[in-house]
C-alpha cells in the first residue's frame, strides 16, 4: 500500500500549537504521525536532534520495537498531523 494511502484512508487528524508536546520521551508508543502541515522538532534529553517538515513521518520506532518513546516530539510551529494507531499500523 502506498504511503499516501495509509494516511489518507480514514485519517485521524490532530492539531498542535507551536511549543506543544506531541509526545514525550518515556511515553508509551500508541501511534505514529505524518506531518500534514507545519514543522516538528525531535529532542533527546532537551537537545534538538531533528527538525521535520510536512510529508515527514515520525514516532514509528515505538510501534516497531514495543518500547517507550526514546525522544520528545514538539510542535515547532502550529501543526496538523495524521496519526496511525498501533492497531492500524500492524494491519498494514
Give, region by region, the residue ranges found by the protein language model:
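Regulatory nucleotide-sensing modules
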Residues: 1-45
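Cyclic-nucleotide recognition modules
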Residues: 9, 50-92
